[in-house]
Amino acid sequence: MRRLIRVALLTLLLLVAAPYVLTLVYGAGQPVSTLMVWRWLAGATVTRQWVDIERMAPALPRTVVASEDAKFCSHSGIDWDSVRDVLDDLQDGGEASRGGSTITQQVAKNLFLWPGRSVVRKALEFPLAMWIDLVLSKQRILELYLNIAEWGPDGQFGAEAGAAYAFGRSAAQLTPQEAALMASILPNPRVRSAKKPGPGVRRLAATYVARARSAELQQCWRENSGS
């Protein structure tokens, strides 16, 4: 019985430690998300073609940062101000009005954890996001996110597949408006559409185009992309 307990504890320790080791490996290469693997195993269609961030239209990563995580360059994996806002929402009304997850947290979840809301998942996600921010560059974190995010209703993952589905072109050819439309459907590409955007998506896109031009995000981009 004791041996069984030791084996179980060792297995649990290895499962918890594995993402921290894999993060070091994922400084290079073209990793896939747990959701992509799950869809493959379930026999669903998965379309993903990796594209380096340098080969994407610059408007896409800029606009995604503007829409998903405006403090991306200044936080260390967790936006604690946003976390406090979420906690305040829960205390005031019992439901958070905004998600609060940074791009780094979404990378942690997409690469190593599972979808859906869970206290256990969040407890694993927070230290993992801080570790990812510590060992990977901001540019690499963003590159990972842009290549593993779900970007279409039929198994399109990554910016290249998303751009091809929505606009019939590569991620390198996106206009600022098209990039903003793609950013506007995250993280719900099965509910929102960049291909046939409704008024709400169009309004969001216009907002994100303006945000991407802010001085703070322009500086963020220069410091982390070399452009």
From Swiss-Prot:
Its EC number is 2.4.99.28. InterPro entries: Glyco_trans_51, Lysozyme-like_dom_sf, PBP_transglycosylase, Pep_trsgly. The chain crosses the membrane at residues 7-27. GO terms for cellular component: peptidoglycan-based cell wall; plasma membrane. It catalyses: [GlcNAc-(1->4)-Mur2Ac(oyl-L-Ala-gamma-D-Glu-L-Lys-D-Ala-D-Ala)](n)-di-trans,octa-cis-undecaprenyl diphosphate + beta-D-GlcNAc-(1->4)-Mur2Ac(oyl-L-Ala-gamma-D-Glu-L-Lys-D-Ala-D-Ala)-di-trans,octa-cis-undecaprenyl diphosphate = [GlcNAc-(1->4)-Mur2Ac(oyl-L-Ala-gamma-D-Glu-L-Lys-D-Ala-D-Ala)](n+1)-di-trans,octa-cis-undecaprenyl diphosphate + di-trans,octa-cis-undecaprenyl diphosphate + H(+). Keywords: Cell inner membrane, Cell membrane, Cell shape, Cell wall biogenesis/degradation, Glycosyltransferase, Membrane, Peptidoglycan synthesis, Transferase, Transmembrane, Transmembrane helix. It is an enzyme of class 2 (transferase). NCBIfam families: mono_pep_trsgly (TIGR02070). HAMAP family: PGT_MtgA. Peptidoglycan polymerase that catalyzes glycan chain elongation from lipid-linked precursors. Belongs to the glycosyltransferase 51 family. This is Biosynthetic peptidoglycan transglycosylase. It comes from Rhodopseudomonas palustris (strain HaA2). The gene is mtgA.
